[in-house]
Amino acid sequence: MAAITFHLDVVSAEKKIFSGRVETFQVTGSEGELGIFHGHTPLLTAIKPGMVRIVKQHGHEEIIYVSGGMVEIQPGTATVLADTAIRGEELDAAKAEEAKRRAEEQIQNQHGDMDFAQAASELAKAIAQLRVIELTKKRR
């Protein structure tokens, strides 16, 4: 028996990253992890930096990094509106490691004019990118 699917779009300010039928997808919402299946209650919520794990028709998976944004669920369709969205295989591990190191350094060497919230946000994004890279490598 074929799984029930619904339409998912993952878009950023630059481009549409994914558009197609999916069995399910997971994303980190502002209140925790969300697993979305066909027939989910309509919802509009903020998403945190992390991944969108997509299970396409026939069980094929795709992982996309998002830097935050919104997810909207409507009957038969869902849209992830990301600030930035990058396919897992397109992420650069060296750049993510460097961004993580810089953010950790800024947090440890706080000065009066340093924006702690900005550094913490950059650290969360770098850690999320590294996690997506790790999961993408395991899938291959």
From Swiss-Prot:
Keywords: ATP synthesis, Cell inner membrane, Cell membrane, CF(1), Hydrogen ion transport, Ion transport, Membrane, Transport. It is a peripheral membrane protein. GO terms for cellular component: plasma membrane; proton-transporting ATP synthase complex. Its main location: membrane. Pfam families: ATP-synt_DE, ATP-synt_DE_N. Disulfide bonds: none annotated. One of its GO terms (molecular function) is proton-transporting ATP synthase activity, rotational mechanism. Belongs to the ATPase epsilon chain family. F-type ATPases have 2 components, CF(1) - the catalytic core - and CF(0) - the membrane proton channel. CF(1) has five subunits: alpha(3), beta(3), gamma(1), delta(1), epsilon(1). CF(0) has three main subunits: a, b and c. Produces ATP from ADP in the presence of a proton gradient across the membrane. This is ATP synthase epsilon chain. The gene is atpC.
